[in-house]
From Swiss-Prot:
Annotated residues for binding of substrate: K170, D202, T238, K239, Y240, E241
GO-annotated molecular function: tRNA (guanine(46)-N7)-methyltransferase activity
PROSITE patterns: SAM_MT_TRMB (PS51625)
UniProt catalytic activity: guanosine(46) in tRNA + S-adenosyl-L-methionine = N(7)-methylguanosine(46) in tRNA + S-adenosyl-L-homocysteine
Name of the protein: tRNA (guanine-N(7)-)-methyltransferase
Region (Disordered), start-end ranges: 1-73
GO cellular component, one term: tRNA methyltransferase complex
A Pfam match: Methyltransf_4
InterPro entries named in the record: SAM-dependent_MTases_sf, tRNA_(Gua-N-7)_MeTrfase_Trmb, tRNA_methyltr_TrmB_bact
Functional note: Catalyzes the formation of N(7)-methylguanine at position 46 (m7G46) in tRNA.
Family classification: Belongs to the class I-like SAM-binding methyltransferase superfamily. TrmB family.
Enzyme Commission number(s): 2.1.1.33
Amino acid sequence: MGHHGQMHAQHGVTMPADSPIGQPDRSEQRYFPATAFRTRRSTLSDAQRQTWDRRWPELGLSVGPAEDPDRPGPPLDTDAWFGRKAPVVLEIGCGNGTSTLAMAKEEPGVDVIAVEVYRRGLAQLLCAIDRDNVTNIRLIRGNALDVLQRLIAPASLTGVRVFFPDPWPKARHHKRRFLQPGTVGLIADRLLPGGVLHVATDHAGYAEHIADVGAGEPRLRPANPDSPLPISVARPTTKYETKAQDAGSAVTEFIWLRR
């Protein structure tokens, strides 16, 4: 386990009470990232396309930009989607789903919603779900900020995972980093009391930024390493992480609890 964020006084974005699912105040948009993902072409293999066509209608959901972002509509009915009532974890930026699949298998009593903008990564995960007959994962293709704002109800998530988000290392691109005060505030709003925000990064500069942003959100507190948690925080080591460590990059992890 890596380092936890240290607490100091800052303030995150506030959520107006009159919004159906806590839409952030328009005046606070500077607290949110600009485009937080890169444009990428994604081509599926024939096998991936066949699995996609067969399983996506059941397990997947595509989310585009809202026509009227001030009226996000009703939140997602996760009990109906999964066919049961269970703790729900939202994983933001699941990539090809290596960690998603492994962690879902280890906790069959926890339902996982994996969000990713790139179709190829989702297709790889969907094929693995189909191959291994995993029943506790659902997929959303779209911008995670749209998902949090429009589909997730306040105080509905047991956990949120953000593993190795794009660090956007150039200073002029820092505004594109996903974990900004507004985003972390929105995540805190969506977590149940006692819920977990679990973040990992291998970029030292982004780690400092994340520590500051997390410390500035008053609804979050660093988890005590000895305290029991409602979900597992044991991640598998991915090929990407191994490559980063071989290159000399240290992985920093943050685990916060919703107050």
